[in-house]
């Protein structure tokens, strides 16, 4: 009964997703506009229970410009988190506020922010982008951008712009894919940004920012296998690397549910309303005793509350997919991107999950 109540709430959010006012940013090319707008967003949170106030302006009100026309510009795009009161000491930077959210960004918002970042890095004067997000969104934004963007320009996601700017400005930040900087100044590949539930210092950092704001790299530049140039995602699913898929194919509903004794018939009954499920494995090992699976919708199993764990396809029910080393949030993001692009077969999903 509890599960049915939760599912009813999840299905209700499918009718709550509406077009974002950020679309006006592209319609009117507001990045280069000389005026500004304040718009109340109707974007729902992932559970459809609340919305954010969106303010965007690229003229005089909410964009701070310390660049010169001749210099490359580092774009700081704010969706939450911490930014300095003034950035007058920083040259060649633009600050643009899209959201001021303290909630985890949903898939609609992630795609909307990606469209802004894409517009930014396509500009020849752009040296790269820093995206400031709240702590709840850091993992999702970092991983989402890692899949969406295939560029040599640095894109750095952070809770605090002061930590990320030295990284984005560092010449060795290129050719690494999207990076994230946590509040303890550790730098991660976006693919391996630690889950929010894990303690600081977890995961696989690639660098650290010292007290003098110098970046100390641990490894030579390279991209994780998941998103490398010869990966399945890059070679066979290049359509993943577009921030516009959501506009063409609609918003996917991919809930995260916890392991339990739910019948396959109940799961299959959701196939008309959800595009997939991520099941959080309750086992202390990589395997699961759960029987949740479906022939109608993709079901992906992931492990929670550990920096890194691996769930293989042989560890899950026959008609399900193992998320490999991806956390539930990362699995939800990848499954959502796949759904947006029509990639739903078990064999295809097995090829893109690690």
Swiss-Prot record:
The stretch of residues making up the signal peptide is 1-19
- Note the coiled coil stretches, chain numbering: none
Instruction: Give the matching InterPro entries.
Output: Asp/glu_Ase-like_sf (IPR036152), Asparaginase/glutaminase-like (IPR006034)
Q: Transmembrane residues, as ranges?
A: none
Q: How is it modified after translation?
A: Extensively N-glycosylated.
Which residues have a glycan attached per UniProt?
40, 50, 53, 58, 61, 65, 87, 94, 100, 106, 118, 172, 239, 286
Upregulation: In response to nutrient limitation. Repressed by high glucose concentrations.
- Any one Gene Ontology cellular component term annotated for this protein: extracellular region
Q: Recite the UniProt keywords alphabetically.
A: Glycoprotein, Secreted, Signal
The UniProt record lists the Asparaginase/glutaminase domain at 50-354
Any one Gene Ontology BP term: cell wall assembly
Q: Which family does it belong to?
A: To yeast sporulation-specific protein SPS100.
Name assigned to this protein: Protein YGP1
